[in-house]
Every structure is written in structure tokens, then in C-alpha cells.
């Protein structure tokens, strides 16, 4: 009888537990990794402090591992990809190979990388870029990605300075917080 009571209590606690969505955030570093992106390192630390948010980081050329991690998330998990510079370029490869990504935020993709159009299953994509290629060292942050569902935000940040822009940082944190509180995926 005691075992049945314990089993019943465990089942009841599981059934009565609140259900909340977990959000997985994959961050794609620029060339030279986190050493070249101290502002992004700070943002990653801030995201890790958010409730129900798991954050993993990847070198831009390791995007296939991010695709694997996204595709192995439990059903109902929200997925976000944040990429800066060549990491933003690599976000397109993630979009085209992953089963589904809720949100991609691409910060100043580089003109010095080949990029196909976004054809993957992405709920929403936001790109922040500087249309003046000379302010981004000849085009390091002025590439416009191509595909459906891309919202473009033009800025006038230098390429190294873009990662410190409060608009970018607040946008990422706000969008992750919104996804974390939604009840169920689309």
C-alpha cells in the first residue's frame, strides 16, 4: 500500500506540474571565435541567466553541429540561432538544413562569404546590417541575406562595434524571452 501511495504521489506531482516551454539558443561565433567578439560573449552570459533558456556556442564553421543539436531538441522546445559576421552567414546553412528554427538573428553578415538563399523552415529571421560597406571594413558587415521572412534592420555600426549595439542586444533578449513564454510551437 505504501508503494502505491508513493507511486500515486509521483504521478500526481508530474500531472500537476506546470508545463513551460524551454528555449534553445545556438550562437555562431565570427571568425576567430569568442576572442573576436567580447560583446557577444557578454550577451551569451546574459542569455544563460534567463530562466528556461539553454545556450550553446559554436564556431561559425561548426554549424552542422548546431543543426544536429537543434534537430535533437525535445518537441515543444523553441529554437533560436544568433550569428555574428561569418556566424551570421552560417545561420543560412543552419536554416536550410535544420528541421525548423523559430528565430534567426543575423548580425552583420559578411560579403566575404558565399551564401545561398534561405530556403529552410524558419519562423522568423531578422538581419541587422550596415548598408555602407566602407564602415564595415570593405563589406564585413554589409551583406544582405536573401530569403522569405527576413526583416532587415539597417544600422551604421562599424563591424567590430555592432556586437555592442544595445538595439541588437535588447532585440535578442526580448525575442528569446517572448519565445520562452509562448505556450506551444506554431
Regions found by a protein language model. Name each.
Residues 117-186:
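C-terminal catalytic-base region of ester-bond hydrolases, centering on the histidine
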Residues 17-21:
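Sec/Tat signal peptide C-region and signal peptidase I cleavage site
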Amino acid at each position: 500500500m505504501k508503494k502505491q501511495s508513493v507511486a500515486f504521489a509521483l504521478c500526481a506531482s508530474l500531472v500537476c506540474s506546470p508545463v513551460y516551454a524551454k528555449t534553445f539558443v545556438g550562437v555562431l561565433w565570427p571568425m576567430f571565435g569568442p576572442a573576436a567578439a567580447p560583446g557577444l560573449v557578454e550577451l551569451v552570459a546574459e542569455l544563460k541567466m534567463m530562466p528556461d533558456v539553454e545556450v550553446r556556442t559554436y564556431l561559425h564553421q561548426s554549424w552542422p553541429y548546431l543543426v544536429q543539436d537543434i534537430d535533437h531538441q525535445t518537441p515543444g522546445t523553441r529554437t533560436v540561432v544568433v550569428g555574428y559576421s561569418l556566424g551570421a552567414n552560417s545561420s543560412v546553412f543552419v536554416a536550410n538544413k535544420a528541421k525548423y528554427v523559430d528565430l534567426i538573428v543575423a548580425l552583420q553578415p559578411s560579403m566575404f562569404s558565399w551564401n545561398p538563399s534561405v530556403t529552410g523552415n524558419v519562423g522568423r529571421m531578422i538581419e541587422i546590417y550596415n548598408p555602407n560597406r566602407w564602415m564595415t571594413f570593405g563589406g564585413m558587415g554589409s551583406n544582405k541575406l536573401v530569403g522569405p521572412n527576413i526583416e532587415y534592420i539597417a544600422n551604421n555600426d562599424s563591424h567590430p562595434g555592432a556586437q555592442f549595439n544595445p538595439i541588437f542586444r535588447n532585440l535578442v533578449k526580448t525575442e528569446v524571452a517572448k519565445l520562452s513564454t509562448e505556450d506551444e510551437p506554431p
